[in-house]
Design a protein with these regions (language model features):
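Non-catalytic terminal accessory segments
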Residues: 1, 233-234, 241-295
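Core catalytic region of metal-dependent phosphoesterases/phosphodiesterases
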Residues: 3, 12, 19-118
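Active-site neighborhood of phospho(di)ester-bond hydrolases with catalytic His/Asp-centered motifs
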Residues: 8-10, 48-53, 79-87, 113-117, ...
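Short, glycine/acidic-enriched loop or turn micro-motifs at the edges of active sites
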Residues: 14, 56, 155, 192, ...
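Catalytic phosphate/metal-binding cores of nucleic-acid and nucleotide-processing enzymes, i.e., regions
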Residues: 15-17, 21, 35, 68-78, ...
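Cap/insert and terminal regions of metallo-dependent hydrolase folds
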Residues: 25-37, 184, 213, 217-219, ...
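Conserved catalytic scaffold of divalent metal-dependent phosphoesterases
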Residues: 67-68, 73-74, 81-175
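Conserved beta-sheet core of the metallophosphoesterase superfamily
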Residues: 163-230, 235
Length: 295
């Protein structure tokens, strides 16, 4: 393995349409990232572990499946091991994963595997899987020295890194303290990239493959390489293009919202809204010419 035992990734959100913020050829941009990761894994002869939301929608459609399979099913491609996130599951149901896009990939691509049970990867590593809807827990026994948890749940870097004010989510140190049985916890769902160490064990949240919203304009998509012997985790930045993300749709929406606010304020200034029905009618008749019959 030339020192690197596995690459950690998450939240690929493979899709056939272009996010509203993107101005480039999004299909091409996705493939460039996949090529980069595949070449890196191929060079080190190691697997790529993807912690959920491999696809953006459960049902991929023939065009997207054809596009992905034709480019990524070569025999020399490295082994991809993915767990399911909510975006991979029809109606968020884990028992339906085989009917979804990732199910088709697992049947069509020899080196693509959807992991849904614990398994021994090699003579050193056991992988414990917690796809969307399954809570991470400590295992009762393991026949391997190194134990890895792959989990798809919202994890934040720390309590100071909430994505919104009253967000309820586990933070990395809490999970590492709660589950000392794992040498590495690989989490997906949070599109930010971070790694947290606690007593020589790591939680790795690789973040999303792509920048899919305007608020990710400053993000640096990455994978992480893990060397078990050295117990080291290195961040590897993926190639990105400049000026492919636009905020125009946000600015347009803000202008529209401002116009609506202005209109509502003018309405409020024009009318004192009163919930006395008879009084409102009288006021209406006074301000508008209404014949006696209508009254």
């Amino acid at each position: 393995c030339m020192g690197i035992d596995f690459l950690v990734s998450a939240d690929w959100h493979i899709r056939g349409d272009r996010p509203v913020c993107r101005t480039d050829d999004y299909m091409e941009a996705q493939q460039k990232k996949i090529e980069f990761i595949s070449n890196l894994a191929g060079f080190h002869d190691c697997p790529i572990l993807v912690a959920g939301d491999f696809g953006h929608r459960p049902m991929w459609g023939d065009r997207l499946l054809n596009w992905f399979i034709s480019r990524n099913s070569k025999v020399e491609r490295p082994h991809i091991i993915a767990i399911c996130g909510q975006h991979d599951l029809p109606n968020h149901r884990l028992d339906k994963w085989e009917e979804a896009g990732v199910g088709v990939l697992s049947k069509s691509i020899e080196n693509f595997e959807v992991a849904h049970n614990d398994f021994n990867y090699d003579n050193r590593i056991q992988i414990h899987t917690y796809p969307y809807g399954e809570k991470i827990q400590c295992f009762t026994e393991s026949a391997r020295k190194i134990n890895i948890a792959m989990v798809h749940q919202m994890v934040i870097k720390s309590q100071d890194d909430k994505l919104w004010h009253d967000q309820k989510a586990d933070h990395a140190k809490r999970l590492l303290r709660k589950f000392p049985c794992y040498d590495y916890i690989l989490s997906g769902d949070n599109h930010q990239s971070f790694v947290v160490e606690h007593e020589g064990r790591y939680l790795i949240n690789a973040g999303s493959l792509m920048r899919m919203s305007a608020n990710q304009i400053g993000d640096l998509p990455s994978v992480y390489s893990v060397d078990i012997r050295k117990n080291s985790v290195e961040r590897v930045y993926l190639p990105i293009e400049k000026d492919v993300i636009s905020r125009e749709h946000i600015d347009v929406a803000k202008k529209r919202d401002d116009r609506i606010d202005s209109f509502v304020n003018r309405l409020n200034e024009s009318y004192d809204i009163d919930f006395d029905f008879e009084k409102n009618l009288e006021e209406f008749f006074t301000k508008n010419k209404v014949n006696e019959k209508t009254k």
